[in-house]
């Protein structure tokens, strides 16, 4: 999640200095910013790279890619690519960069510019159309998805992607509204309908629609599937000593990253009868330090930083 509130350095990423340090940037290295956003991390990486260094700037948001091209299109060190980060392995392989990436950074979730743009439809704090696509050049909008999804799938998405306890009740209300020709068309209308179907007192400091909006966004963008697909190829991309740095903003993402690093950091335990090459049993990553969260000062300056957690792993030889 790139950026902070207006009035400060509007697009300063959360844990910026910590992420740059964790990458252990070498002047001649090859690095990948898998979530360019508005370029805060990229600028920091480029400042530490020498003329022979290389940086891939990747984002699925056309607006972010436009910013990348405007700022770094003339920099010979930069390769700019529009697409999901799970498409990265194929692109890097085509460029001959398997096992040659010295650092890969992922700043997951929705960016502050996306949240702050009413037209994008990510936030109920600003009245706008129900879009929610991270890539506005393809895919269905949230409104289109709600027009065709069945109640069971919708309920499961709200439960699994939003950890919403009242997923069935909310799903039933949305399907009923659709059948009555009253399916919400704006973020505000959707938030109100959801709030009406969340019983009890709301959680302190959290709108009743927060979990559902997260779930819908994750579902229509395939965020967790993209993350899982990329993680499975990380060890094919990183050079020995290369770093993986991931900043997550909710437990669904962080659990996946934590589980992946743990799995790749342990020795395989298979029966002697299973014919596996010895190197296949060896750990491929080592966890670097503990999970890191923003300090009190950063959280006070940027409330969106409160849920952030950064994990780092290093590719073993």
From Swiss-Prot:
Q: What is its main location?
A: cytoplasm
Q: Which InterPro entries match?
A: RsmH (IPR002903), SAM-dep_MeTrfase_MraW_recog (IPR023397), SAM-dependent_MTases_sf (IPR029063)
Q: Which domain of life is it from?
A: Bacteria
Q: Which GO CC annotations does the UniProt entry carry?
A: cytoplasm
Q: Does the keyword Methyltransferase apply?
A: yes
Indicate which residues the UniProt annotation says bind S-adenosyl-L-methionine.
Answer: 39-41, 59, 85, 107, 114
Instruction: Supply one GO BP term.
Output: rRNA base methylation
Q: Which reaction does it catalyse?
A: cytidine(1402) in 16S rRNA + S-adenosyl-L-methionine = N(4)-methylcytidine(1402) in 16S rRNA + S-adenosyl-L-homocysteine + H(+)
First-tier enzyme category under EC = transferase
Per UniProt, subcellular location reads as: Cytoplasm
Enzyme Commission numbers on file: 2.1.1.199
Molecular-function GO term, any one: rRNA (cytosine-N4-)-methyltransferase activity
Going by the UniProt record, its keywords in alphabetical order are: Cytoplasm, Methyltransferase, rRNA processing, S-adenosyl-L-methionine, Transferase
Cross-referenced PANTHER family: 12S RRNA N4-METHYLCYTIDINE METHYLTRANSFERASE, S-ADENOSYL-METHYLTRANSFERASE MRAW
Q: Which family does it belong to?
A: Belongs to the methyltransferase superfamily. RsmH family.
Summarizing the function annotation, the protein's role is:
Specifically methylates the N4 position of cytidine in position 1402 (C1402) of 16S rRNA.
State the name under which the record lists this protein: Ribosomal RNA small subunit methyltransferase H
Instruction: Give the organism the record lists.
Output: Alkalilimnicola ehrlichii (strain ATCC BAA-1101 / DSM 17681 / MLHE-1)
Provide the gene name from the record.
rsmH
